[in-house]
Amino acid sequence: MIHWIRSTESFPPIEEALNDPNGLLAAGGDLSPERLLDAYRHGIFPWYNEGQPVLWWSPDPRMVLFVDEFKVSRSLRRSVSRGDFDITVDSAFGHVIEACAAPRDGRLGTWITAAMIDAYTRLHRHGYAHSVEAWFDGKLAGGLYGVAIGRMFYGESMFARLTDASKVALVHLIEMLKQRDMPLIDCQQQTPHLARLGARLVPRRVFAEAVARLVNSPQPVGAWSIAAPPVAEVP
């Protein structure tokens, strides 16, 4: 049974999510900053297609990346060492999320609808959503965005117009998270690409316990800044 939630109602317990499709917990509600932050604090995220109601998910198991387990290939290490890209943070959030929403691989669109773009842009203005940008010759070549609450980071999407652009942005994100004592990235869905970067599956119960602990650890809210890691310190 899928729970239908109205704008004033709370989420049901994540243990009540469906097994098939894995993790579908509820439908309805809205994408207000308050609703989104409440969802993330409970290990829930929105994912739906244009024309559907908002669908809320909490899959079991959950794909996560512990920052200390991040894997950097030799080619990526060389790209970082060469300084192929100029990296900025929170300087082009709107451009990053719109690029992530653009059709790719022959598909007509992505799950990042216009309503989602508006919602996460509001979160960015509130200081919770962040972007990392990779620039080449003054043009945006790749990047990523996600949500930070306390010491927890929730990865949302990434894009690349040039080889390794998004991965170099991820290297810098990992360094920033280490500096902020933020040990865990929620990757939401299992993919071979994430596994190659060091992400792995954990039981939903374990993930929820980690989230409950990390989101309640105080961290400043607002725009981030970056100090590029020395090449010798790149994992």
Predicted feature locations:
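N-acyltransferase acceptor-side catalytic subdomain
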Residues: 1-235
